[in-house]
Amino acid sequence: MSAAIHRRAKNFRWEGVDVLPYKEDARALFKGVTRQVLFRNPEQESELRYFEVAPGGFSTLERHRHTHSVLILRGRGCCLVGRDVRQLDTNDLVAVPPMTWHQFRAAEGEPLGFLCMVNSTRDKPQLPSAEDLAALEGDPAVAAFLRGAW
């Protein structure tokens, strides 16, 4: 992005901002997610990204050392942060601490769009092992969330 102003196009798209694949790791399980990098400035040492999860879709269940700061811009859904399952609506804020399992899911009838700020330099996400999943699924609310029954 070289221009100082990128005009809003339609449906949460911006002129001159590419819609990118969500992940490039074939092992990461997700459904119906796109990513746009809105700001990447080395002097700020952060990136502001827009993710959109299609109706009924979900992001990868993952954890990492860096934090996420999330603002829901569009739609409704649910998120898992640690063992906390919460409903999401427009303008809700979600803070994801380091090394915390997290995932976002869109409601069936509408997309879930959110801004996510992260450090420019960050570690790669870790996917859960079978043991990690078993531990998470020991909590009935988390197990229901992971099955998509929230």
Segment roles from a protein language model:
Residues 1-45, 131-150:
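A short, N-terminal "cap"/entry segment at the start of jelly-roll beta-barrel domains
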